[in-house]
UniProtKB/Swiss-Prot annotation:
Gene name tied to this protein: Msantd1
Stated name of the protein: Myb/SANT-like DNA-binding domain-containing protein 1
Origin: domain of life: Eukaryota
UniProt cross-references to InterPro entries, sorted A to Z: Myb/SANT-like_DNA-bd_dom_prot, Myb_DNA-bind_4
Residue span, Myb-like domain: 44-131
Annotated Polar residues bias: 149-166
Disulfide bridge partners, by residue number: none
Pfam families hit by this protein: Myb_DNA-bind_4 (PF13837)
Disordered: annotated span: 139-167
Length: 278
C-alpha cells in the first residue's frame, strides 16, 4: 500500500478550513504582525509627566506643524524629543491623535464657558490656550510698499528752482493753482493716513464682536440641543412610568382574580365536606 506523507494535512485543511486558518495564524511569528493589527491594540494611558512633556514639545513644534501639510516627519521628531525628555517611547501617530483629541476638548470647553468667566477646571486648558493663541502678527495699519505720504510744504518749496523764485510772477492765477494743488495733495495724504489708522483700530473691535457673536450662537445651539435632549429624556421617562402603571394594574387584577378563585375553591371544599358528613 502506497502512503503519501503530505496527503493527510492537505485533506484536513480541505475538510476543516477554520482549523487550518487557526494553525496558520498560530505559526506566524510575532515580528510578522501587520501594523493594522498593532493599531487595534489598546494604547497605554498618558502619564502626567508625559502630558507635561507633550505640552512643551507641542509648543516647540507648533509653527513647524502649521507650516507643513504632510507633517508625519514632524510628529516623528516630536516623538523622539518626547522620548529624550521623559524616557517614554510614543509613536508619531499616537502624538497626533492625542493632540487632535486635546484640541477638540479645548474647543468644546471654550464654547461651553464664557470668555470673561473663570477658566474650566482642566489642568491643560491654559497651556493649550497659550499654544493655540500663537498667530502671525498681522500687517494691518502699515502702508503698502511704494506708497509714500504726500509732499509737505517745505519739500515743495525746496523743490522749486531758484530761477522760478527770481523771475517775476506775471501769472498769479497759475501760481495759486499750483499752491492749491500741493495743499490738496497734503490734505489727501493726511486724510488717507487718518482713515487707515481708523480702519486699523476698527478691525480688532469688529473681530472681537464677530467672535463674541459666533460664541453666543454656538452657546445657543448647544443650549437648544441640551433642551431637546432633556425633553426627549422626559418623554421617555413618562412613557416608562405609564408602562409601569399598566403592569402594576395588570398585577393587581391578577391578584384579585386569584383571590376570587381561592374563595370559590374554599366554598366548594366546604360543600364537599358537608355532603360527606351527611
Amino acid at each position: 500500500m502506497v502512503r503519501w506523507p503530505g496527503l493527510r494535512p492537505c485533506l484536513s485543511a480541505i475538510l476543516n478550513p477554520a482549523g487550518a486558518s487557526n494553525m496558520a495564524a498560530a505559526e506566524v511569528p510575532g515580528y510578522l504582525v501587520s501594523p493594522q493589527t498593532e493599531k487595534h491594540r489598546r494604547a497605554r494611558n498618558w502619564t502626567d509627566a508625559e502630558m507635561r512633556g507633550l505640552m512643551l514639545v507641542w509648543e516647540e513644534f507648533f509653527d513647524e506643524l502649521k507650516q507643513t501639510k504632510r507633517n508625519a516627519k514632524v510628529y516623528e521628531k516630536m516623538a523622539s524629543k518626547l522620548f529624550e525628555m521623559t524616557g517614554e517611547r510614543r509613536l508619531g501617530e499616537e502624538i497626533k491623535i492625542k493632540i487632535t483629541n486635546m484640541t477638540f476638548q479645548y474647543r468644546k470647553l471654550k464654547c461651553m464657558t464664557d470668555s470673561e468667566s473663570i477658566p474650566p477646571d482642566w489642568p491643560y486648558y491654559l497651556a493649550i490656550d497659550r499654544i493655540l493663541a500663537k498667530v502671525p502678527e498681522s500687517c494691518e495699519g502699515k502702508l503698502p510698499d511704494g506708497q509714500q505720504p504726500g509732499p509737505s510744504t517745505s519739500q515743495t518749496e525746496a523743490s522749486l528752482s531758484p530761477s522760478a523764485k527770481s523771475t517775476p510772477l506775471y501769472l498769479p492765477y497759475t501760481q495759486c493753482s499750483y499752491e492749491g494743488h500741493f495743499e490738496d495733495d497734503r490734505s489727501d495724504s493726511s486724510s488717507s493716513l487718518l482713515s487707515l489708522k481708523f480702519r486699523s483700530e476698527e478691525r480688532p473691535v469688529k473681530k472681537r464682536k464677530m467672535r463674541s457673536c459666533h460664541l453666543q450662537k454656538k452657546k445657543l445651539r448647544l443650549l437648544e440641543a441640551m433642551l431637546e435632549e432633556q425633553r426627549r429624556l422626559s418623554r421617555a421617562m413618562e412613557e416608562t412610568c405609564r408602562e409601569v402603571r399598566r403592569v402594576l394594574d395588570q398585577q393587581n387584577i391578577l391578584q384579585v382574580q386569584s383571590l376570587q378563585l381561592q374563595e370559590r375553591m374554599m366554598s366548594l371544599l366546604e360543600k364537599i365536606i358537608a355532603k360527606s358528613n351527611v
